[in-house]
From Swiss-Prot:
Heterodimer composed of CysD, the smaller subunit, and CysN. The keyword Nucleotide-binding applies. Belongs to the PAPS reductase family. CysD subfamily. Keywords: ATP-binding, Nucleotide-binding, Nucleotidyltransferase, Transferase. One of its GO terms (molecular function) is ATP binding. InterPro entries: PAPS_reduct_dom, Rossmann-like_a/b/a_fold, SO4_adenylTrfase_ssu, Sulfate_adenylyltrnsfr_sub2. With CysN forms the ATP sulfurylase (ATPS) that catalyzes the adenylation of sulfate producing adenosine 5'-phosphosulfate (APS) and diphosphate, the first enzymatic step in sulfur assimilation pathway. APS synthesis involves the formation of a high-energy phosphoric-sulfuric acid anhydride bond driven by GTP hydrolysis by CysN coupled to ATP hydrolysis by CysD. Pathway: Sulfur metabolism; hydrogen sulfide biosynthesis; sulfite from sulfate: step 1/3. This is Sulfate adenylyltransferase subunit 2. It catalyses: sulfate + ATP + H(+) = adenosine 5'-phosphosulfate + diphosphate. The gene is cysD.
Length: 301
């Protein structure tokens, strides 16, 4: 009798197929590793896809210099434990100019340390494909992006010029300098990700679990006081609150949520009841009209 695959098994099989397809079709692929929960799942799937061999590509982390300290510690540990080559790229010109999210704002900071830094890294190592952990349920511009997302020689994305994807057939043809961003988790939801992490016992950054942390309420968000670069504004004060993060980015631009969910089952239960997007806590999604789509057109993840 034929075994009926569960919903998560179907998603896993589709993702592994996409990862293998990219590895087979492209000469020099790389996996973007942001250290978040989606990256953790994608890394786990890549290891499964080629087990017992090591995946035939490196990990690339674009370091904005403003990531949570726990993320950097976790990144280095996971890369070492999994045996991956970890490439870390920083936009040194941005560092020299002293660009930071407090003085220059989230839009400029994101453009310099994420978008431009990613384009620099892709050009430097001549990658023709890059895996990303974006999902269609996260945000409206990502909802209309293909699994194989074509990028021009300048890394730009044109939402009106996308290739058809029929069933599980993907067009991997690119000219010199062009590239593809591949999204194996496109059809997953946030709840799918958490259930898979629980079932597969996948390690994740402790910031996803609720505990008492020092936070400041700023612009309607709870910002973690992660280091001494966070300067308090007049009237602000640091409070200890039980919080966790649904999404991770640069700490001054990522809001925590008040929560008591300290275990995976508790997080899953919380997800079953929530009615808001996980990216509501990402300031970069709201710093201008059509923010995410504009960033993606310019070369963002």
């Amino acid at each position: 009798m034929e075994k009926v695959m569960t919903h998560l098994e179907q998603l896993e099989a589709e993702s592994i197929h996409i990862i293998r397809e990219v590895a087979a079709e492209f000469e020099n692929p790389v996996m973007l590793y942001s250290v978040g929960k989606d990256s953790a799942v994608m890394l786990h799937l890549a290891r499964k896809a080629f087990y017992p061999a090591r995946p035939p590509f490196s990990l690339l982390h674009v370091d904005t210099t403003w990531k949570f300290r726990e993320m950097i510690t976790f990144r280095d540990r996971m890369a070492a434990e999994c045996g991956f080559d970890l490439l870390v790229h920083i936009n040194e010109e941005g560092v020299r100019q002293g660009i930071n999210p407090f003085v220059h704002g989230s839009a400029v900071h994101t453009d310099v340390f994420k978008t431009e830094a990613l384009k620099q890294a892709l050009d430097k190592y001549k990658f023709d494909a890059a895996f990303g952990g974006a999902r269609r349920d996260e945000e409206k511009s990502r909802a209309k992006e293909r699994i194989f997302s074509f990028r021009t020689s300048t890394h730009r994305w044109d939402p009106k010029n996308q290739r058809p994807e029929l069933w599980n057939i993907y067009n991997a043809k690119v000219q010199q300098g062009e590239s593809i961003r591949a999204f194996p988790l496109s059809n997953w939801t946030e709840l799918d990700v958490w259930q898979y992490i629980y079932l597969e016992n996948i390690p994740i950054v402790p910031l996803y679990f609720a505990k008492e942390r020092p936070v400041v309420e700023r612009d309607g968000m709870l910002i973690l006081v992660d280091d001494d670069r966070l300067q308090l504004r007049p009237g602000e004060r640091v409070e200890m609150k039980s919080v966790r993060f649904r999404t991770l980015g640069c700490y001054p631009l990522t809001g925590a949520v008040e929560s008591t969910a300290a275990t995976l089952p508790e997080i899953i239960q919380e997800m079953l009841l929530t009615r808001t997007s996980e990216r509501q806590g990402r300031l970069i999604d709201h710093d201008q009209s059509g923010s995410m789509e504009k960033k993606k057109q310019e070369g963002y993840f």
